[in-house]
Amino acid sequence: MAKPAKRVAVTGAAGQIAYSLLFRIANGDLLGKDQPVILQLLDLPQAQAAVKGVVMELDDCAFPLLAGVVITDDPKVAFKDADVALLVGARPRSKGMERKDLLSANAEIFTVQGAALNEVASRDVKVLVVGNPANTNAYIAMKSAPDLPKKNFTAMLRLDHNRALSQLAAKSGKPVASIEKLAVWGNHSPTMYPDFRFATAEGESLLKLINDDEWNRNTFIPTVGKRGAAIIEARGLSSAASAANAAIDHVRDWVLGTNGKWVTMGIPSDGSYGIPEDIIYGVPVTCENGEYKRVEGLEIDAFSREKMDATLAELLEERDGVAHLLKN
């Protein structure tokens, strides 16, 4: 017997990331090949015609799992009974825009969306914020949804995780699928800290295999941190397909489990690893039965502490920059 359809809300539905995302969701890549989905698509009033065009294409794919589509400019319609909410739309940084202006423009969007989720979404809704600054946007949405569990709100660090995996595979000559126990700590920004001290490939320590601290500090960490900028430089457009792929990975693993493998998610801190509570911070997790669980008890050396504190300082600055815009 067919499963009842799950409702997946996607914001920024007319944008480039959504264009790479929606067809894969409708194809079963997000929630499984036996799980029908209803897409609930949100974008601005001026983007509604473009969203309709995307939906025409979705129709033309005749996806067996696509049980329905809603198009709206009202967050309360888009998030109604949503099981998953992918918050992709955000205000991009325009030329000459100060970071604080970007923060307040996004605070406005994510307070409204957080409040709408609070009011109408499923109480078990899984929220992934993709739109930048993702960690702080997720924090704003979480703080604007006091009736939903904090653990429902996450930010995407999976793109950074996947970028780090690919760099490590290239350097070590090992298949990307063989690499386990990678962590990416902190903010989805160039301050993030990709950490392969615990990582293995085919059971061997990557630290021993690569054995090049200079490469780690001066090539690997900056390459992962600045990869988004390098793609804009090369392509003239920001990474969209790889971001959509990471969003699929993040939610699929959260829902269907990681079989004990570590992945990175931006989640509300519980105070461990010296991160203040509620800050949405990238940490290694495993997922099982629809829940994520942080990997605990990892040793933090002096270099790692310095890196983790630097990315935390940026997150605290962002949090303080939006504090006056939040009621709670």
UniProtKB/Swiss-Prot annotation:
Gene designation per UniProt: mdh
Organism superkingdom: Bacteria
GO biological process assignments: malate metabolic process; tricarboxylic acid cycle
Active-site residues, as the UniProt record annotates them: H188
Role played: Catalyzes the reversible oxidation of malate to oxaloacetate.
Enzyme class, first EC level, given as a word: oxidoreductase
Binding residue positions for NAD(+): G12, A13, A14, G15, Q16, I17, A18, N106, Q113, V130, G131, N132
Designated name of the protein: Malate dehydrogenase
Catalytic activity: (S)-malate + NAD(+) = oxaloacetate + NADH + H(+)
A Pfam family per the record: Ldh_1_C
Molecular function in Gene Ontology: L-malate dehydrogenase (NAD+) activity
Enzyme Commission code(s) on record: 1.1.1.37
Alphabetic keyword roster: NAD, Oxidoreductase, Tricarboxylic acid cycle
Family, per entry: Belongs to the LDH/MDH superfamily. MDH type 2 family.
Binding positions for substrate per the UniProt entry: R93, R99, N132, R163
